[in-house]
Amino acid sequence: MVKSSLQRILNSHCFAREKEGDKRSATLHASRTMPLLSQHSRGGCSSESSRAALHCCSNLGPGPRWCSYVPHPPLKIPGGRGNSQRDHSLSASVLYSDERLNVTEEPTANDKTRVLSIQSRLTEAKQVTWRAVWNGGGLYIELPAGPSPEGSKDSFAALLEFAEEQLQADHVFICFPKNREDRAALLRTFSFLGFEIVRPGHPLVPKRPDACFMVYTLERED
């Protein structure tokens, strides 16, 4: 279960070098908002098919791609603001809220796909925000660019608990650009935590040769 990895996440060196005294903003964004891929989503994959597809990540061929909403490394939108950011939908609704997390959902054209903004409250004045996509039993999260922001380790642990306990997720995916300088450290750390590399051509991730995807399969007790 994911809880068995939470302490290792908190002790992970990828989250250990958080900046102290960062007063640039009361709100820390743990990931840049990513523009969506092409808008031709065909529908989600069932939990059962997801489990079967992920049984052996290293030996899968191409498959159907529903993933037009899946997170991926940011791109500049022609004619846009050029800062890889997009405004949160004014029609976003609250999906879940407790003393640590506030999760809002943005409407999409595909009723099987949910775009989530997950805000983790660290203090009364500071929070970390993750952008994620929920589809077919899988939660897709982009890791932040650059050094981990202060509080990201606790925020990520709370996010995984939310995926397991509230979403009842079958899989949690992370993605980041292949050209990141800390790519090797990320691969080592998340492999130690139980994440597996998702090979190119996997039917549950977008066709993005510039991005690396890893997956954690949540096992439930009977």
Curated annotation (Swiss-Prot):
Domain of life of the organism encoding this protein: Eukaryota
Pfam families in UniProt: ODC_AZ
One BP term from GO: positive regulation of protein catabolic process
GO cellular component: cytoplasm; nucleus
One example GO MF annotation: ornithine decarboxylase inhibitor activity
Keywords attached to this entry: Polyamine biosynthesis, Transport
PROSITE patterns: ODC_AZ
Function as written in the Swiss-Prot or TrEMBL entry: Ornithine decarboxylase (ODC) antizyme protein that negatively regulates ODC activity and intracellular polyamine biosynthesis and uptake in response to increased intracellular polyamine levels. Binds to ODC monomers, inhibiting the assembly of the functional ODC homodimer, and targets the monomers for ubiquitin-independent proteolytic destruction by the 26S proteasome. Triggers ODC degradation by inducing the exposure of a cryptic proteasome-interacting surface of ODC. Stabilizes AZIN2 by interfering with its ubiquitination.
UniProt record similarity statement: Belongs to the ODC antizyme family.
Assembly description: Interacts with ODC1 and thereby sterically blocks ODC homodimerization. Forms a ternary complex with PSMB4 and OAZ1 before PSMB4 is incorporated into the 20S proteasome. Interacts with AZIN2; this interaction disrupts the interaction between the antizyme and ODC1. Interacts with FAM171A1.
Full protein name: Ornithine decarboxylase antizyme 1
Taxon lineage: Eukaryota, Metazoa, Chordata, Craniata, Vertebrata
